[in-house]
Amino acid sequence: MTARKVVEGFDGLVNTHAQSIRGFEIPMNWNSPTHPEFLTTDGRRLPVNRVFCIAKNYEEHAKEMGGEVDRKAPFHFQKSFDALTVGPEVRYPTQTDDLHHEVELVAVLGQGGRHLSLKDAEATIFGYAVGLDFTRRDRQAEAKEKGRPWEIAKNFDDAGVIGVVTPKTEIGLMEHAAISLDVNGETRQSGNIDQMAYNTVELIAFLSTLQELKAGDLVFTGTPSGVGSVIRGDHLVGKIDGLQDLPMTLI
């Protein structure tokens, strides 16, 4: 098929289904995306912007995954904002037989900026919440083996869960707090956020060197060791001292 035939075929498709590509006439209901909202302890509902996730930020978790903490710079990936949910029911994803839990401290930004100093990075923090980062561990292993990105393992419906956000004005800068996850009443993960290789302020400052951060951005700061599989029907409770618990059930 010649290039001209391809172009003519595309033009015909556009004319049939969209009338005019220049006018962006869309023959369907195309609504603006709805950003999920998180709830604060003082009753506000605020929209999520972007979701940044830090990997291998606890030494023992890095070891249990067969790796090590990168001491040169944090390693991060992103989830789509619409992959986030507040629960309490969380959908078990398709395309996996090995879904893993990862409890995390989440920092919520109230303002942003570029190339932030540590002082300015601290000032961007609006508050904190307990979060869960779910992983298709079998698909992640496949991606690692082939040298591919982790997106298939980390980005899907209900791939991230965020609890009620406690403003920093209520709790201060969080540097030391026990963090844990219970599954069906049994503690699976346990640690302290002071075990992070890079603390929350350092993570925000680093991310600001890569792109402009904005209000509503979330930073999942990594998980302690003890990650493992969960199945439909399991009841999970994420806990961090000083923050509201995050309960959920997989359906």
Residue ranges and their predicted role:
Residues 16-18:
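Short hydrophobic alpha-helical segments enriched in small aliphatic residues
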Residues 21-126:
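Extended, compositionally biased flexible segments
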Residues 4, 11-12, 80-81, 224, ...:
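Generic detector of bulky aromatic hydrophobic side chains
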Residues 27-46, 57, 61-69, 129, ...:
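Catalytic-pocket segment enriched in acidic/His residues
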